[in-house]
């Protein structure tokens, strides 16, 4: 009897955690909504992130609450002797939270740790181009998202570069955190967690068409608004068009209207207007 009671107690505890944790996060975010960031943190956001000034007062309050919750939940680790500062943590957290401003209290449930390198880092990539021969090569990366390890890796040098070049269509933080959103439904396939079945059907139809259009443009050496790296696979396409949406929104809307509208509906945000 005793083992059965213990098992039942454990199961009830797990059920209570699964049910209660999201509610606790909602409650915690509402509590933090009433607590603004320190003035010197607000000054950093205003100085480094153009979108901060464009937010409505309510959106700004919401962003600041999400930043505080994010910093409490996620662990930051400096790698290769990189020294983490409040500014580093704040700049990363703010962009991650801006991306998911309207996506609930826990948009990155699989993420535990953010590793920050001073500059681009090397990783060993194992591929099998023909399905049989395994090839290994060292590649240089500015960021990487790992699902199973609960880790995300960023290079501060690339982040600093991006901060000086808003609206160039490149943002490593948006890119890697879009991958995290992609994992929200348990699979990294270029389709994040959506609402209704119709949303999935529309998403897959438009994204498949736009992905093929990008491949065709590149094959014919035509100019593209979307970075060519998006043609790597559907996962990278979603991450790349997220960068494009937030940094080159007007161009995306003009050239890829349906794709723009799908992303606008998902993120529930208007992209940057003037930076």
Curated annotation (Swiss-Prot):
GO terms for molecular function: aminopeptidase activity; metallopeptidase activity. It comes from the Bacteria. Gene3D superfamilies: Collagenase (Catalytic Domain), Glucose-regulated metallo-peptidase M90, N-terminal domain. It holds the Pfam family Peptidase_M90. GO terms for cellular component: cytosol. InterPro entries: MetalloPept_cat_dom_sf (IPR024079), MtfA_fam (IPR010384), MtfA_N (IPR042252). Belongs to the MtfA family. This is Uncharacterized protein slr2042.
């Amino acid at each position: 009897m005793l083992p059965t009671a213990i098992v039942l107690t454990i199961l009830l505890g797990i059920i209570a955690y699964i049910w209660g944790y999201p509610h606790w996060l909602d409650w915690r975010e509402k509590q933090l909504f009433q607590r603004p960031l320190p003035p010197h943190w607000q000054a950093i956001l205003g100085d480094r992130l153009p979108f901060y000034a464009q937010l409505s007062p309510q959106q700004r309050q919401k962003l600041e609450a999400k930043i505080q919750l994010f910093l409490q939940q996620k662990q930051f680790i400096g790698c290769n002797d990189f020294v983490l500062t409040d500014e580093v943590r704040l700049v990363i957290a703010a962009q991650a939270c801006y991306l998911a401003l309207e996506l609930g209290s826990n948009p990155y449930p699989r993420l535990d740790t953010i590793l920050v390198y001073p500059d681009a880092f090397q990783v060993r990539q194992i591929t099998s181009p023909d399905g049989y021969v395994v090839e290994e090569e060292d590649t240089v990366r500015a960021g990487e998202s790992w699902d199973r390890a609960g880790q995300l890796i960023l290079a501060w040098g690339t982040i600093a570069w991006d901060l000086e070049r808003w609206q160039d269509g490149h943002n490593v933080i948006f890119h890697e955190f879009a991958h995290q959103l992609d994992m929200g439904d348990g699979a990294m396939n270029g389709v994040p967690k959506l609402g209704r079945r119709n949303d999935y059907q529309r998403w897959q139809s438009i994204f498949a068409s736009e992905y093929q259009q990008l491949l065709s443009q590149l094959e014919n050496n035509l100019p593209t608004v979307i970075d060519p790296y998006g043609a790597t696979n559907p996962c990278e396409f979603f991450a790349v068009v997220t960068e494009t949406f937030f940094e080159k929104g007007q161009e995306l809307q003009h050239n890829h209207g349906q794709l723009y509208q799908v992303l606008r509906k998902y993120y529930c945000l208007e992209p940057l207007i003037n930076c």
